[in-house]
Amino acid sequence: MTAEDFLTGQILLIDKPLHWTSFQAVNKMKWALKSKLGLKKIKIGHAGTLDPLASGLLLVCTGKATKQIAELQGQAKEYTGTFYIGATTPSFDLETEIDESFLTSHITEQLIYKTVEQFLGEIDQKPPIFSAIKKDGKRLYEHARAGETVEIAFRKTTIYEFEITRIDLPEVNFRIKCSKGTYIRSIANDFGKAMDSGSHLTALRRTKIGDYDVANAIDVLAFVDPLENAK
């Protein structure tokens, strides 16, 4: 693609690596477009943040395609990942250490499959304290790191599909299709509670946004390197 193509507008499917922030991925691409294609100014942004501890599909829009970001953000998302049953963390994932352990001797495959049914359709979900949502002028994670207790309101979200793909306790693998604004970390935490135990998220990968599939995505560096020859 040429510089003009990117200015006209492209929707780029990027497979975000684990431990990268979404901002880092977009920034790397923006730097490459400006420095390697000689673009002094170009609009670029992504249609939905992925946590550093998650990998997978990031839709990056350039030029006039940035006008589609809001529409793309509103599309259903699909994820695969792993719950660790029997322990919780304050962040609901591996960002923080285990803070409490729970019994799992009563948990059977039948209970796991039955619990899934409670999460299908429209549900009330409380976002994690370790999230970027603003409360009283600060991000929730800023309150959390300062040791402050804040009241977090429930939000409506919709789970379209929830499939258990592997059970090997304490690990449970899943596939979830959900609406915009769903926190899979919160589902992990709530899933454990629903079984009178605890749970946290140990792996997460976004596989789809609407009809866009990570199978058709490329790595950030695989995007950057060919630009050397694109002038």
Pin down the residues of each PLM region.
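Catalytic/RNA-binding core of pseudouridine synthases
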Residues: 1-231
